Amino acid sequence: MLSAQDLELLRRALGRDLTDVEIACFDNLWSEHCSYRSTKPLLRTLPTEGKDVLLGPGDDAAIVRFSDTCAIAIGMESHNHPSYVDPYDGAATGVGGIVRDVLSMGARPIALMDPLYFGTLDQEKNRYLFEHVVNGIADYGNCIGVPVVRGELVFDPSFAGNPLVNVVCIGTVAPDRVLTARVKRPGNHLVLIGSSTGRDGLGGASFASRDLAEDAEASDRPSVQVGDPYTEKLLIEAILEMAETGKVLSCRDLGAAGLAGASSEMASTFGAIIHADRVHLREAGMVPREIMLAESQERMLVEVAPKDVSTMGAIAEKYDLRWSDIGEVIADPRYIVTFCGEVVADIPIDLLVGGTPTEAWPKQPYVAETPFTRPDEPIKELALLVLAHPDVANKAWVYEQYDKDVQLQTVSFRQDAAVLRLQDRALVLSCGCNPRHIYLKPYEGAANAVIENASNLACLGAEPLCIVDCLNFASPVHPEIYWQLEQSVLGLGDMARKMEIPVVGGNVSLYNESDEFETQIKPTPSLGMAGRGDVRSWTAPREGDVLAVIGATGIDFGGSVLDAVTGCGGSAPPLADPGVVSIVRDLVGQGRVTGVTDLSRGGLLAAIAKVAPRADLHLSGDPLESLFSETYGRFLVAVRDEGALAGIDHRVVGTVGGDALTVRWDGGSLILTPEELEAALASTTRLMCY
């Protein structure tokens, strides 16, 4: 609902009362979800330009040069609230929406990533949400033929009642064939293509801009869209064929705020008149407000010259898609909606699209770190607890549901990053962040998320091209939450600037709180990162290899997996030095290592258990610190001979080989058999399969 202040501001600006269609348009387009009214000043601090950035923030997706003849379109979106109310359809339509964002740039979607965040799996409701979100993503992605090649899973009590479903899509397009979402000239027509419009998703943008109520599953169900991936597949091929004609002048996906959002934003540099009665409908008796604001899926809006309308219609019909010539671009900077000859909305377009007042929220720093308390449990018990935590455990139950090889470009998807072959180079992809660390130290945690994703790319020898983000936070009306948000954006921007990685697009999702579970999510500025390098697969260390750690280990247990399973507390990791990322990237590029992985969740123990489960380690100092600390900017590397690391600061920790994972330190040892490791790492799969 529009606030009383906003409604009064609009009455004064227009000099009259608003129609119901106008109120609905402003309610959605002035919502947090569409207008970024709480975050615009912060977002302007991010570095958005770079030598390969062809089109940065402001369109449906960003365009980044990959080679002289190939560019990537990349975007990232959230579908958080819908995925709680209806996890299957909420997640599925989240995939569909970001795919259409990339498609609207004239790009063929080639890959998806899905960083996901849930409450702990000891609660049946969270298991239900987890299962159906993954099913929704898998079914939609598989049906449209776009591989899900990378993801992230985080389980924390703060996400109970408000899971986060973030999706990254990447597409490819020739640099000279890029479409944009801004109309080109008055007199051109706006043609709606795709599914018929129904009442599903009504008010979705407004719904995404408030807390989840206790009865959200029932009361907010009409705000959740229902997807049809088979229509989406036809729409992909139809839009690409239309773009190939050179007659599509601009294009936009119908997402948040439906036709009202797409057409007003598209025509914001001129004006538009929309004939709502011409829209092809799925349900009888729909009124103009419903037609304009419904968020029915699988719909696109294209601008074409009047003489080319029939050409677009013929292509749509070839793919058995419905289409309607529903509007025109006008020179007058107004947004006009008619229905059966009656004007039902007539407002200044710049007021609707760019006139949202900026919110200025108070902020309050906080201190959340607690003193470290050493756990009483034996090291082996702690090791098995950490390995069985779902953040660390094997993710096979998830990725086995995804078709990762469709389109035949996927080279590798396991371990640190996904690799796709584009022409003769590799597109390397990573995603995610660590909400527990960011909660304790918002600035440092967000900055370290940049380093973590760049580290994943470095393990495959790739250099970052760009970042996209989803800024997921609780309600900014709480001063401590707005401080989290501010510090996270500043940390992200400063590290991206330092590493010269432009932030080219993204999404803001606020009000992630649950009345039902009485939770506020931990701050989650989830990232997607794309990089470029030589084509290579991740390789496991070989027997006899020397294992070494590059990068210094600190006493950083706060927000760690060890902290999650024991409540030990402690300090979160400090700001890491990004210089080590370049060192490791060069090592990989020069072929001096036989295997490499970065150290992140679960520390050295988790890394070694996954990449070299049969190894002999000798640790100096405190084994708790060596095994479980989660200091950023560290890598586990394998080399045939330590001489390969000459001139690089490192610490040898062991060798690959043997019958088990054996760890020795002064005064103690730990042996984990292959059976024990497999049982611990399979904990999530066992839970979800039986």
Model-derived features: positions:
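Glycine-/charge-enriched secondary-structure boundary and capping motifs
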Residues: 6, 14-23, 161-163, 248, ...
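Glycine-rich phosphate/pyrophosphate-binding loop regions near the starts of catalytic domains
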Residues: 15, 24-234, 240-249, 264, ...
